[in-house]
């Protein structure tokens, strides 16, 4: 079977709370339209025919997920997440030990476009390392002085990218790199950083800048605008 036709599993770490949203409800359970942010994020993955299973890592005390239609979806598996994102991803990887390639997608990134997902999945044909969706930095970037709200210097943006999700890697490689990085006390901010720590260089697959992560209150209205626009375009 050609590599481009291999089935793919996805892991969605959804055990976080997201205190920057300034709400009592975890951000992944806030609603946009008639769905939660988590549902929008997961349905975007399931819309691709290669994605056959999604593992969602939730907090052990989470009582909200069971109320969603996702809880009874035949392609959804739920596992207990950990205190950190990497712990939740590892728990998800353990649940899909049979998978060769795995997507990892943010629970609060609901605006994923199918053409971006298709381009990312296509790299499995020729890559042994995988890659991530990313968007080139377009704004002027400043580095601040340590401990001060003052500019230290301007950062050259020519080779800077915003890391997005999904991120897409061979399952065994990602599992081994995450495990090693955690055991050695490395700072892991996303899955690609674990591979970087172990000496690998994942590909950058340019994706749309409107694939935003809902982190702050103002992001919710922006995500709603992007999703509404996409729905209208699909109906046109």
Swiss-Prot record:
Sites annotated Transition state stabilizer: 20, 27
Pathway the protein contributes to: Isoprenoid biosynthesis; isopentenyl diphosphate biosynthesis via DXP pathway; isopentenyl diphosphate from 1-deoxy-D-xylulose 5-phosphate: step 2/6
Biological process, per Gene Ontology: isopentenyl diphosphate biosynthetic process, methylerythritol 4-phosphate pathway
Record bears the keyword Nucleotidyltransferase: yes
Catalytic activity as recorded in UniProt: 2-C-methyl-D-erythritol 4-phosphate + CTP + H(+) = 4-CDP-2-C-methyl-D-erythritol + diphosphate
CDD domains registered for this protein in UniProt: CDP-ME_synthetase (cd02516)
InterPro entries linked: IspD, IspD/TarI, IspD/TarI_cytidylyltransf_bact, ISPD_synthase_CS, Nucleotide-diphossugar_trans
Keywords: Isoprene biosynthesis, Nucleotidyltransferase, Transferase
Database matches in SUPFAM superfamilies: Nucleotide-diphospho-sugar transferases (SSF53448)
Zinc-finger is among the record's keywords: no
Molecular function (Gene Ontology), one example: 2-C-methyl-D-erythritol 4-phosphate cytidylyltransferase activity
EC number: 2.7.7.60
Top-level taxon: Bacteria
Family: Belongs to the IspD/TarI cytidylyltransferase family. IspD subfamily.
Task performed by this protein: Catalyzes the formation of 4-diphosphocytidyl-2-C-methyl-D-erythritol from CTP and 2-C-methyl-D-erythritol 4-phosphate (MEP).
Quaternary structure, from the entry: Homodimer.
HAMAP family in alphabetical order: IspD
Protein name per the record: 2-C-methyl-D-erythritol 4-phosphate cytidylyltransferase
Organism: Salmonella paratyphi B (strain ATCC BAA-1250 / SPB7)
Classification lineage: Bacteria, Pseudomonadati, Pseudomonadota, Gammaproteobacteria, Enterobacterales
